[in-house]
Amino acid sequence: MNSFFITFEGIDGAGKSTHINFVEKYLQDNHIPFISTREPGGTPLGEKLRNHLLNEDMDPYTETLLMFSSRMQHINEIIKPNLDKGVSVLSDRFTDATYAYQHGGKGVNEAFIHELKTLVHSKINPNITFLFDCPIEISLERLQTTRKLDKFEKEEKSFHQKVRDAYLKLAKAEPDRFVIIDSSQTIETIQIQIEQSLDKLIS
């Protein structure tokens, strides 16, 4: 059985979590084995780094290097072994998030990130990436009703706009991989779009 690497991206407050659960149920219903993971995190080491990355102020380049350190461990310990044995992998964020947040939001040189990506996972890339997109005003409003915010979620509106713009630029550059979902739509409408994309992926 083929395994699939499916990633979920979007600005904070775009509403990924509900739809990740929907994809999990879709794969279960279609008898496709999978695991769900997240970035930063996904491994014991990655989860320790996650706490530092989301809550401590640091130089943007240090942040980027730590993201890729966590990612390399994640790939070698979780992602690659599962894909190799036919188990699909769902990841809440992957390298696109580093381009969006560290390059788009914080100005880290894009070539620096690209070089790290080439070193860490030149041969492992998502089969499909769902990008949940909505106006910044909606995402920020949603964030006010959730849990305690991390350092990225607390950033100014201009930061979130730059992250959103970077995500849309990535999606435009790779239209065959990205599925842009307007997450301001109803849950039912969004899930119909997701299901159609997954049907095409596994057919």
Name what the model sees in each region.
Residues 2-5:
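Pre-Walker A (Motif I) flank of P-loop NTPase domains
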Residues 8:
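Hydrophobic anchor at the beta1->P-loop junction of P-loop NTPases
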Residues 13:
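Walker A (P-loop) phosphate-binding loop of P-loop NTPases
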Residues 24, 137-203:
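NTP-dependent small-molecule kinase module
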Residues 98-165:
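A glycine- and Lys/Arg-enriched "phosphate-lid" helix/loop adjacent to the NTP-binding pocket
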